Amino acid sequence: VSPFALVKEIRKEFGGTVILSGCMTSGGDILAARAMGADLAYIGTRFIATAEANAVPAYKEMIVDSASADIAYTSLFTGVPGSYLKGSIRNAGLDPDNLPEASKDRMDFGKSKADAKAWRDIWGAGQGVGNIGDILPTRDVVMRMEQEYREALRQLGAS
């Protein structure tokens, strides 16, 4: 469901705090979420690629090097649908473009690396990865987002 439709539908039925997530990596994205009616923006993948994140360096680098086309959406690994970096799926010995049907009975890493596990070896990431170009301290990411938010707000006021 498009976030434009979703936030409006939620607002019709719910007067509480609405938190929007998905593909947000900048202050402009946060402003857009607020303009759609969300109270807060929930940002995930951007903060994996920070100096303080408890993720291995290869995971952070893969995020920086990826685009939205490098994301596979599947429930194969955990039983719950999720977005994963295709490169990490390949590294586990699987073809991300030809994954077997999602079924816990068919989950078998024995044909590839026997110890591959979701989140440790198969890395989650959202479709906004293509807009992440660096690994910075969290403080710098937040400061940049604040500047971007203010600049986007200024641009809207100027138009």
Segment roles from a protein language model:
Residues 2-19, 24-159:
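Conserved active-site-proximal phosphate/metal-binding subdomains
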